């Protein structure tokens, strides 16, 4: 008699590790910027540029980009801003890591703050949480029935067991991976200042974030919708002594190509924020 089997392809977690990373550096104020009297706010973003696996460890390379809003002692205009970066390269212990397999790294910026060393130097400190894992593809043989030797020789598809042999079967639900990919979804839009707001000369500080982010499968694609929240602090034209701010929301709706998918499938989608930029135009 023979055990009939069916092969199932699956991904199993090979290894994983969590750690906290502290980034800290002293940053000089650029020569073109006035002295710092008081720090108002700092905003940081993490950009992971490369992840690679080595034997029993993972290497993460990236940088912390920050924007600092501060108060100066200049009478002409007291509010100023400066930007900077802190590069990092970290080795994470990852037992049983395979150098030939891809490493997946998830990260969160838990804290980012700045302190004043002197009027021309600040200390920037950030805490970054990292979760790294590696998955390996396996092929499993699942038993589907027992057939007699005569049935095997006759190439009969009936899985009825031979006399004297009992079998117990249970249904098992499985899914098949249709697509596994990475892609970029770019949001590029523009908005006008409302009436009553002066024109923008220079952007001092801005914040961009998403709200109500939702994904839905469509035929051969993934639909992404949400709102982009915008806050801008700027100096107006012909009046650099004063400051103006502007807040608004911009809806976005777009489709990322994903060949072979449709709305009846089950999706496992992860969205990671990328680079942000904002500029004023006349």
How should these model regions be labeled?
Residues 1-282:
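Viral structural modules
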């Amino acid at each position: 008699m023979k055990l009939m089997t069916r092969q199932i392809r699956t991904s199993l977690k090979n290894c994983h590790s969590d750690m906290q990373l502290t980034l800290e550096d002293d940053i000089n104020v650029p020569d073109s910027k006035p002295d710092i009297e008081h720090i108002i706010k700092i905003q940081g973003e993490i950009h992971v540029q490369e992840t690679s696996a080595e034997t029993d460890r993972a290497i993460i390379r990236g940088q912390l980009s920050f924007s600092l809003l501060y108060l100066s002692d200049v009478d002409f205009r007291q509010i100023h801003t400066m930007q900077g970066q802190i590069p990092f390269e970290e080795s994470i212990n990852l037992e049983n890591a395979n150098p030939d397999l891809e490493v997946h790294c998830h990260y969160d910026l838990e804290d980012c703050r700045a302190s004043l060393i002197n009027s021309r130097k600040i200390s920037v400190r950030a805490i970054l949480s990292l979760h790294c894992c590696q998955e390996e593809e396996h092929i499993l043989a699942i038993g589907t029935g027992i057939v007699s030797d005569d049935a095997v020789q006759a190439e009969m598809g009936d899985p009825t067991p031979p006399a004297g042999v009992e079998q117990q079967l249970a249904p098992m639900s499985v899914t098949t991976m249709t697509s596994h990919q990475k892609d970029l979804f770019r949001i590029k839009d523009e908005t006008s200042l409302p009436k009553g707001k002066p024109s923008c000369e220079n952007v001092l500080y801005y914040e961009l974030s998403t709200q109500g982010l939702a994904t839905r499968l469509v035929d051969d694609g993934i639909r992404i919708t949400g709102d982009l929240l915008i806050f801008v602090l700027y100096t107006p034209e012909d009046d650099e002594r004063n400051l103006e701010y502007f807040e608004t929301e911009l809806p976005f709706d777009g489709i990322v190509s994903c060949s072979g998918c449709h709305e009846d499938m089950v999706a496992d989608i992860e969205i990671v924020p990328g680079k942000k930029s904002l500029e004023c135009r006349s």
